[in-house]
Amino acid sequence: ICDFDTINSFYAMGQMKWELADESIKGGKITITVLPVSSGIGMALAIKTSGLLPSDKLSWDFRGEKIYEGQHLSWIFDVMGQPELLSWGVEEDEEIIVGGDLVSGNVEQYLVLKADENGTIIQMNNAEKEFLSGSKKLQTICGRLKIKTPDPYLNALAQSSVRSVDGTWYPPVFVHGCMQWNRPFPGWRSIFGGTMYGWHERVKEEAKYYIDSQV
């Protein structure tokens, strides 16, 4: 993605979207939307192309799988502590785990990669269904907050915050943060999100967990 001449990035309610254009595909445009799968570990992509020639070809691959056993990844991948992580990119000599070609033509296509019970990355066959299921789950989560102000940015930011609070839920407790500092801190302010967004059963579950551990 980083090699395209024009890159527009958008984030809203737990999903990313990129609009890409390049001199090598004059008049062509590629839009990629990525969101988490509704269950398990994985990602679902919707790839839409327009203005491409019949001879244009779109290929993909997943590579660079790394296993970190017994390590806390939210600390290892903390860019404030390890700024060199910002220079990471694609390395051509990395092993391709899975890959393929997409159908030629200006159509919307779907791709889903999930980790199976052994941690192996596999390509799912029912990609469109998986994508729509993941999208519906995000809409349900973020739809817990109804907001309508004159500021569209505030509206988008507020609804996105619901997904962030959901990301701090590590049953049976809320953790400090979704990525960095995602450690369980009793009484930390992330529990306020569970209260404000109506996850009262989660708040009660956390309370019971800590109260039961009191001596």
Task: Locate each region found by the language model.
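An extended acidic
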Residues: 1-20, 100, 104, 127-146, ...
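Extended, loop-rich substrate-binding clefts of extracytoplasmic carbohydrate-active enzymes
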Residues: 2-39, 159, 163
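Secondary-structure transition/capping motifs at alpha-helix termini
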Residues: 24-27, 50-55, 197-202, 213-215
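Short amphipathic beta-strand starts and helix->beta connectors
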Residues: 26-30, 95, 174
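Polysaccharide-binding surfaces and accessory modules of carbohydrate-active proteins
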Residues: 32-116, 135
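Short glycine/proline/serine/threonine-rich loop/turn segments at secondary-structure transition edges
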Residues: 119-123
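Substrate-binding groove/exosite segments of carbohydrate-active enzymes
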Residues: 139-215
